[in-house]
């Protein structure tokens, strides 16, 4: 593949994505959990290993229900410490939401938002990412999004610190980042979104800090497999299969 050109063989993954919503309540606990379940499409141009899809679905489900169970146990502990009703009971609510932000070239990028409130006061706000190579089932790391031999840690660190310095009042004084290999991120058609946890580099009231590295501005550094846009989407089965074969050799 010519590294000086945008990928011209982008194609959508042929997956069926089932929307699931689980709602329930008891006296002091309410939950509304939304999440996807992935399935192969019959006669699609490629079939993801069933074990890969099963592992992905189980991982997403476990993240949600483990979070819900932890908050439920907290509610039980708080409210059972007050059996005589001398103190006001605490109402807990748990939510999950998701976005499938990239679904092309046998790669998916999904973000899962987990939030919990007590008496309408936010207590937890976690953002999970699932960047999966559907050929191998492996979780993609930040290094995989860049071309070989790119000093991606310095590149991303410099970009994020530049953005922080553009708006310093939004962040903690002297906030500076040194991006690790396991940095949290997700993919979109537009670029790579680097993000941090609540209260990590900015006060929690500012929500989760995110930084978009647009592919168009970093084209010479980006692995073309991930650089897709409306102008290079391909629906031709033959070309998609050719890309799949090339991809297996290259990676």
Annotate each language-model stretch with its function.
Residues 1-251:
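Compositionally biased intrinsically disordered regions enriched in Thr/Gly
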